[in-house]
Regions:
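Conserved SAM-binding motif I beta-strand of class I
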Residues: 58-63
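Conserved SAM-binding loop of SAM-dependent methyltransferases across substrates and taxa
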Residues: 45-56
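A short SAM/SAH-binding and catalytic strip from SAM-dependent methyltransferases
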Residues: 99-115
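Conserved class I S-adenosyl-L-methionine
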Residues: 32-42
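C-terminal substrate-binding/active-site "lid" region of AdoMet-derived donor-dependent transferases
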Residues: 111-179
Length: 180
């Protein structure tokens, strides 16, 4: 784990029990072999848990921080899962149309609360929060019927009006959405 990251585990990284429930919802939809996108995947816990649970699905994590991408790649190599992959880059370079499900653990929050930043490797700005949420919302709006999205924490700014909230859990912090 990168230096300084451990103190952020409860704030920035998905608890295993949340990953299990989120993966179950995302893989339980209309697609036989769903492709799931994890936005802001960090060290890849959600993707690795989901990939271990659902061999027929494929999980892709996208993360901006190279140090976290490196850890995710190491964990993936150790896990020997062949249905998980990680991209190191910006979410605005990802085509959501390649996926049938999306997992969002409040990936842009630190742009609003710089004091909660994990490190100083990416530029933080409240404008980026709006830009990234807007990009995700537009991408989700264009997705086909039955696309599934799970949000953990966050205010749901990324969720377009053409999605229904179909399930909640973990004190209503976990929300499961489906495209109409």
């Amino acid at each position: 784990m990168p230096v300084g990251t451990r103190r952020h585990t409860s704030t920035h990284f998905t608890p295993v029990e949340v990953a299990v429930e989120a993966a179950q919802f995302l893989c339980g939809g209309a697609w036989e072999n769903p492709k799931i996108l994890d936005v802001g995947s960090g060290m890849g816990k959600f993707c690795l848990v989901g990939g271990a649970m659902f061999e027929q699905a494929h999980f892709t994590g996208v993360e901006q921080r190279k140090s976290l991408c490196d850890v995710a790649d190491q964990l993936l190599e150790y896990s020997e899962l062949n249905n998980v992959g990680f991209l190191c880059g910006n979410i605005m370079n990802v085509k959501f149309s390649d996926f049938q499900g999306v997992y969002l653990y409040n990936p842009f929050y630190e742009h609003l609360q710089p004091f909660s930043a994990m490190d100083e490797t990416i530029e933080l700005d409240a404008d980026y929060y709006e830009i990234y949420c807007g990009y995700v919302r537009k991408q989700l709006q264009r997705m086909p019927k039955n696309t599934r999205v799970v949000t953990y924490f966050g205010g749901g700014e990324e969720i377009p009006l053409n999605y229904d909230l179909v399930k909640q859990g973990f004190h209503n912090d976990l929300k499961c959405w489906q495209r109409r």
